[in-house]
Every structure is written in C-alpha cells, then in structure tokens.
Amino acid sequence: MLISAPRGTKDILPGQSRHWQTLEDTIRRLCREYGYEEIRTPIFEHSEVFHRGVGDTTDIVQKETYDFQDRGGRDLTLRPEGTAPTVRALLEHKLYAGSLPVKLYYTGPMFRFGRPQTVRLRQFHQFGIEVFGASGPRVDAEVIAMAMDFYSRLGLKNLELLLNSIGCPACRPAYREALHQFLRPKGGELCEDCKKRMDRNPLRVLDCKNQRCQELSQGAPTTVNHLCDDCANHFADVKELLDAAGVAYSLDDRLVRGLDYYTKTAFEIVSRDIGAQSSIGGGGRYDHLVEALGGPPVPGIGFGLGLERVLLTMKNQGLLDADSREQRDLFIALAGEGTQPVAFGLAQKLRQRGVAVEMDYLERSLKAQMKTADRFRVPYVVIVGEGELKEGKLTLRTMATGEQQQIPLGEAAEYLDNLFANREN
C-alpha cells in the first residue's frame, strides 16, 4: 500500500521550492531593512503557553490544537501560531531587560486541526513579526505598513487592508456588556458554539463564520463607539500615520481577530483572488499578553501572514514563473573514453568557485546530453571529447546562438570562472 502525506499537509516539491525561496529571500531583506532580528522557537511548546496566551475561549485552543503527552507525562502542543511562543522566549531569556524595543521575526510551520481546504491546511507556514516595549501609535503604523510593503514587493494587487480598534481592559467591559445585551434576545438562534461564547467572550460571536450568526449580529454595537479616550486617541493617531504614509485602509467595525490577546489596534489583509477564505494575513496589538504569561508589563504588537495563501494569490494573479526549476550556470557533457576524470575534476573546481554545474551521470549520447542541458536552461555547455582531450582542449558551446569555441584544458577553470564573473558584473 502506497503511503501518502497526512491529510491536510502538502509536500513542497523541487519545482515549487523556488517560489518559497523567493518568499524567504524577500522576508529576510524586508526584516533587515526594518531592523528586525530572527528568532526560532521549538515547533512544540508546553500546552499552557497557548492556554494562557492564545486564550481558552478561542476556537484555536478548544478545537484546533494538536495536543499530546510525551513519555514523561508532560502536556505539549504543536504550535498553532507564533506570537505566544515568541513571548515565552522573550520571558525565558529576559530579552526585554536590554534595549527596547525588541523587534523579532520568524518563519516556519504552524499546526491547526480542521477540515482541510485549498487555503486551510493542517500544517501551514507563517511569516510573523513581533515588537515588544513600544506602546505608541507609530509602531502600530509601521507594523501595518511593513505587512503591506511585503505584499507590494511580491507584486500583489487588489488587496484590502481592514482596520479596527477593539479597546483595552478599561473600556472593553462596557462594550462586552452592550454586545451581550444586544445578542441576548437572539441567543436561542445562535449556533451551539456562539451560545457558549455569549457568556465567555461575546466578541467571538462577531468572528463566527456561521451565516445565521452573521445575520443575527448585524447592527450590533461597535467597539469604536465604546472606546475610552486613550484608545480613541491612539486609533486616530494610527489612522493619521497610515494616511501620511499613503497606506490605504478600510474601517471594519466587526473585525475582532480570532485570538483573545488583542487590544487596541487590530487589522487584517484580504485578497478576493483566493475565494471565500480571503484573509492572507493580519495582526494587532497585545499590551497584556506578556503579563498573562507571567512577565512584567511589556506592550507588544505584531502580525502573522499565511505564506500558502500568499503563494496562491500570486499564482491566481499570474505572478509565479511557470518554469520554477533551479537554473544551472553550466552543463558538462562527456563524449568518448577517458573523459570522466577530466569532466569530474573540472566540475569540482568550478563548483568551489561558486559556479552551478550539472553533468551527465547516465552514460547517455551527446545528443541526449544536449537535450538535458537545454532542460536545465544553461547558457553554456562544455563538451569534454576524447579527440579534443588528446589535443589538450575543451569545446565551449553558447546555447543561445549555437556558437562553439575551443579553450585550452589547463586554462578552462580560470576562463569559465571569469566568464561567469563578468556576466554577473
């Protein structure tokens, strides 16, 4: 019986990995230019990190985490998101005790159980950033602008930035009560999950994907109409800064995000080119998450962007190269007896100088080797022929024109190295 990848997971094959490398290269350049340093946390954490960090009332913790006990009886969870693990690392290593703000980024796989869909996998990849120690609106605006800059560098179009403020512990209780009073008469018609959310955290009802729940919550009180002065001023400043930077956005008073730790600014980026599951990233401020995980009062803000969704959007917008195979610089073809040692030695010399070299391993005819070279899209082929070797020469063919020239065997490595160095310059 053939064993396949687990449901909800996908292999990233050689023809696809080039696209991922493009994303990763863009991420590294972006983060360097914005002053972020990389952090890498374990793929699994103590379950308490997510129960205390993400929130016990969230769908993620209640329905979607991969939980298990190790042989020592410890409760562990495959990470469903990157913020809580980053906060755990911040506290464990006292990164907050140095110069502030602390600006971190990460990429890697996350895990959530759910019904697999085209853009909803059980193992998926995120690019995220976190900023700790800065509470002013300027860092909120920078984080949002940075997310949009990432998409812009990839060439993505037709994206919409949704923006909201969901208040803070000072003003949210009054809003929760107003929302609860609005929903109470309709409670019997809500889905079973939202009936439970009514008392635990009624804001989750606004995030429900059930169509009937969405209909029942139409006309509900909005967070922006219940903000305290501090939150209202903060939100006004964020909008002013985004306007000054030319970052377009749409206000969405139903946007609450799916995690309990958010305060004040919340945002989401959507693409209409990937179907109903249109979110390709989002984030917000979480000024009390560090305390919730046992640390001092350190404000934070960040985002998480789904990379599979980014790639799907790029594909649907025609931004992915159809031929994504790795291009080699040079192919070495062998023709005749006694050519292998020379060809192999030349290949190793060139590789050590940074030239990407492919060669034949299957003892094929010269004609078949040239077809292989064409498939690799190499600009040049070196033919190591039995007759030429007797004369101390090699043949260099330019694939674009078909022109050939002979080069001395003893000077071949230096000549070819200079050829590619000049092309790069």
UniProtKB/Swiss-Prot annotation:
It comes from the Bacteria. GO terms for biological process: histidyl-tRNA aminoacylation. The keyword Chaperone does not apply. Disulfide bonds: none annotated. It is found in: Cytoplasm. GO terms for molecular function: ATP binding; catalytic activity, acting on a protein; histidine-tRNA ligase activity; transferase activity. Belongs to the class-II aminoacyl-tRNA synthetase family. This is Histidine--tRNA ligase. It comes from Heliobacterium modesticaldum (strain ATCC 51547 / Ice1). The gene is hisS.
